[in-house]
Regions:
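Bacterial Sec-dependent N-terminal signal peptides
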Residues: 1-24
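Mature, structured domains of secreted/extracytosolic soluble proteins
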Residues: 18-202
Length: 202
């Protein structure tokens, strides 16, 4: 009887010790959420809602071309500002789809205005979620029109695969591949093609 009593004490004590030493599955992420806001995993990069647009896109090499373009266009402070701003952010792969030499030309100092025009053609004043875009599409017979900071027009539609497609002034299409990435100064959506404005030569 004594032996069984001792065995029970050992088991119970061990369980208590394990419970005391147990750690949450994601202690770092949980603490970040509590302190800094929501965390969203975007292709392996953890973007935090308390960061501004520049801070978050700067966390991943996938947006290095966009970051450089924003800097060269003199728009860094714009996308750091309180906003709110909605940015449709092209990935590096999206920029690679541009015709050969166009990006290199845009990044030259004498094309700063053209580059500024291109980047601001991806931005809208206000914080616009995918649900907001969908509602506007549905309330306008399947097509929504948005005015960008550059003054250009973006048309949004829903394709057969239920993707939201943005159409630029040239008829070029870009799919929103990642969406509703909250920023301290607005909203970030990732797009798979560059939206090229029509009225300026690129």
């Amino acid at each position: 009887m004594k032996k069984w009593f001792i065995v029970i004490l050992i088991i119970v004590g061990g369980q208590r010790l394990f419970a005391q030493n147990a750690k949450p599955a994601n202690p770092v992420i949980d603490s970040v959420k509590a302190k800094w806001g929501k965390v969203k995993n975007v292709n392996g990069t953890k973007m935090i809602s308390s960061n501004n647009i520049i801070e978050n896109i700067g966390l991943s090499n996938e947006y290095s071309v966009l970051v450089t373009a924003i800097e060269d266009a003199g728009l860094t402070e714009t996308f750091k500002s309180k906003g709110p701003i909605t940015l449709f952010a092209p990935t590096n792969q999206a920029f690679e789809k541009l015709p050969a030499g166009e990006l290199d030309t845009l990044l030259k100092p004498n094309h700063k205005l053209d580059l500024n025009y291109l980047i601001t053609s991806h931005a809208i004043v206000g914080s616009l979620s995918v649900r907001d875009i969908q509602r506007k599409i549905n309330s306008n017979k399947g097509e929504a029109t948005f005015r960008t900071i550059a003054g250009t027009t973006l048309i949004a539609k829903i394709d057969a695969n239920r993707n939201i497609v943005l159409i630029d002034d040239n008829g070029g299409e870009s799919i929103i591949s990642k969406f509703d990435i909250q920023q301290s100064n607005g909203m970030l959506h990732i797009v798979n093609s560059v939206l090229v404005p029509k009225t300026k030569s690129i």
